[in-house]
A protein has these predicted regions:
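Juxtamembrane transmembrane-helix termini in multi-pass membrane transport proteins
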Residues: 2-73, 133-152, 156, 168
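Short hydrophobic "helix-edge" motifs at membrane interfaces and signal-peptide entry regions
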Residues: 10-11, 25, 113-116, 126, ...
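Residue-level hotspots within the lipid-embedded alpha helices of multi-pass solute transporters
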Residues: 13-17, 121, 125, 157-165
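Cytosolic-biased juxtamembrane loops and peripheral soluble domains of multi-pass membrane proteins
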Residues: 91-120, 177
């Protein structure tokens, strides 16, 4: 892949990654309530989710999602239900403790955060279909596809993980304002409500 093409891909990927969506919302919610203890787990989960979604797109699943109403609807509802389920769980946990209680590893293991981040990122039919339209713009038709796909996947996944980590650390710095159980519970409920709202929005997605 030529350097100027790769730089264009990096710029386009950056613009895509900073757009708020289910993944960034989840990252910020967990960072505010769990702290930077789970930041690496979130970044790793986002990386895995994007790797699966992008790889599936390049292997043809994205084209199938874009043309199959049934598969698109199935993935849409799985993602929507999962987001609502997590939002309700986050809301219900708000009354249990303030930040000291929320930050205990036993309350929410890093492995669970990793799985949540990976699933929310991967189970987004719009992302899978988007990669189908996004990636071909940077492919050189006369060159072998394998090396180009490898470079683009490695680049995008690395940027996605770094983006999630930075958002998590920035959100973690805001935790100093959450010094009382009341404020911590308020932010937790807000995050839960936002996840439920994002799940409901996901349920209304239509194929482009």
């Amino acid at each position: 892949m030529d350097l100027h093409v790769w730089l264009a891909f990096v710029a386009a990927s950056l613009a895509l990654l900073v757009i708020p969506g289910p993944t960034l919302l989840l990252v910020v919610s967990y960072a505010l309530t769990q702290g930077r203890r789970v930041a690496v787990a979130m970044a790793a989960g986002v990386a895995l989710g994007d790797f699966l979604a992008m790889s599936a797109s390049l292997l043809g699943l994205g084209a199938l999602v874009a043309t199959s109403a049934t598969l698109f609807t199935l993935l849409k509802w799985i993602g929507a239900v999962y987001l609502v389920w997590m939002g309700i769980g986050l809301w219900r946990s708000a009354g249990k403790a303030g930040l000291q209680g929320l930050s205990r590893p036993a309350d929410l293991p890093a492995g669970q955060v990793f799985r949540h981040a990976a699933l929310v990122t991967a189970l987004n039919p719009k992302s899978i279909a988007f990669f189908v339209a996004f990636v071909p713009q940077f492919i050189a038709p006369g060159a072998p596809l394998g090396p180009q796909f490898t470079v683009m996947i490695a680049t995008f996944v690395s940027m996605a993980a770094l983006n999630a980590l930075l958002f998590a650390l920035l959100a973690n710095r805001m935790r100093r304002f959450l010094t009382t159980p009341h404020s911590a519970a308020w932010v937790t409920r807000l995050g839960g409500a936002a996840l439920v709202g994002m799940g409901l929005m996901t349920a209304t997605l239509r194929r482009a």
